Design a protein with these regions (language model features):
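Short, glycine-/small- and polar/acidic-enriched structural segments
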Residues: 32-181, 188, 195-201, 212-219, ...
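Conserved C-terminal helix/tail region of periplasmic/extracytoplasmic solute-binding proteins
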Residues: 309-363
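Secondary-structure end/capping motifs
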Residues: 240-319
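Short linear loop/turn motifs
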Residues: 77-78, 85-86, 177, 283-292, ...
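Short, low-complexity disordered leader/linker segments with a strong preference
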Residues: 1-43, 343-363
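Pocket-lining segment of extracytoplasmic ligand-binding domains
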Residues: 176-177, 183-273
Length: 363
């Protein structure tokens, strides 16, 4: 081969190699378009039980009233069922997409029994759940429950978990009186059938105005940030509707930011929507123990799972379950970041606080 031909051939090979190398480089990630983020469905079916009629879902009510759901291109359809047990049966039948007010213990029990649910957000971080007794009962602290009868279920880990940490066996060291409904727990204490009782947030008015009983403490006094109600859905549904989940969370985060600045207006709205007297609503919503929060609170959920497992509330098969496989914090973080970018100027301190909380409880 002639010298000039050899040079030309070498240059051609070099140029070709450079071109091929350029083709192998990753292009900068494109910003998702509005079409890419469009919700996969415009309707989310949210569980709503007869037991919730006193307060419903306050963040969702705000989101509807303020147009936040509409801004995200979705609407929430309330699916009425009788109670929490019916919520999970309806989820299994495909009649409900999302549950938000069924506690943390109940979805964890469902997961332990093999139901493929994923927790992706929160509603109440701590409800103001009162522990009460007759007015003349002496009280020195949580250990006073040992050897007594408590009108409640032992899966209330906000109380049984700290007792477990103290070295007690809560399932056997306390007699648990399970009743048909929570009003009956109050009656059980009044009649002397139970020494102590615990009821849910919305019964604070009934407990506070009952002259025969007194509030000794609240669940969050024993276990701060215990995770009262988590938001969960079938894992497959979340995987198939990530944009819808983000849209729902964005609407609820904005509602939480609104609530942060408009407490009294929210009370008036809840009273109007539920036809309840403001005094009944303020008995819990003004209580400092009452903390609504959309954050999934992964660390609190893990702690709850460990307490329930260690107390023997799960089957042996549940020991093979990694609860982290049933917690999705990424979609919430994406929704929070998007809200802060779009609406952060409306309440900067709120978004800074929520970002700090996420970093503390979800990493």
């Amino acid at each position: 081969m002639k010298r000039n031909d050899l040079i030309r051939c070498t240059l051609c090979l070099l140029i070709a190699a450079l071109l091929l190398a350029g083709c192998g480089r990753s292009a900068p990630a494109a910003t998702p378009s509005a079409e890419d983020l469009k919700p996969e469905t415009d309707v989310v079916r949210l569980a709503y039980t007869l037991e919730l009629s006193a307060n419903g879902h306050i963040f969702n009510a705000i989101a509807e009233q303020q147009g936040y759901l509409e801004d995200e291109g979705i609407r929430v359809e309330h699916v009425m069922v009788a109670n929490d047990a019916a919520v999970f049966k309806a989820i299994q039948k495909g009649q409900i997409d999302v549950a938000s007010n069924s506690g943390t213990n109940l979805p964890l029990q469902q997961i332990a029994e093999g139901m493929d649910l994923t927790i992706f957000g929160g509603y109440m971080l701590t409800g103001c759940m009162p522990l009460f007794s007759l007015v003349d009962t002496e009280w020195d602290g949580l250990e006073d429950l040992v050897g007594k009868t408590v009108a409640c279920e032992p899966n209330l880990y906000a109380i049984t978990g700290p007792l477990l940490d103290m070295g007690y066996d809560p399932l056997h060291d306390i007699h648990w009186l399970e009743t048909e409904n929570q009003i009956d727990r109050i009656k059980a204490v009044e009649s002397g059938e139970a020494d102590f009782g615990v009821v849910g947030t919305t019964l604070n008015y009934e407990v506070n105005t009952n002259p025969n009983i007194k509030i000794l403490a609240y669940a969050s006094d024993f276990l701060p940030n215990y995770s009262c109600c988590r938001v969960e859905a079938p894992t497959d549904w979340i995987n198939e509707h990530p944009n819808t989940v983000r849209a729902l969370l964005k609407a609820w985060i904005r509602a939480m930011a609104y609530y942060d600045l408009h407490h009294d207006e929210t009370v008036e709205m809840v009273a109007r929507l539920t036809y309840e007297e403001e005094a009944i609503i303020r008995a819990y919503i003004d209580n400092p123990h009452y903390d609504m929060n959309v954050d999934p609170m992964k660390r609190s959920v893990e702690r709850a799972w460990n307490y329930m497992r260690d107390m023997g509330l799960f089957s042996k098969e549940a020991e093979q379950i990694d609860i982290d496989d049933h917690i999705n914090v990424e979609l919430y973080k994406q929704a929070l970041d998007a809200c802060q970018e779009q609406y952060g100027s409306e309440n900067p301190k709120f978004y800074e606080r929520m970002q700090a909380q996420f970093a503390l409880y979800n990493n």
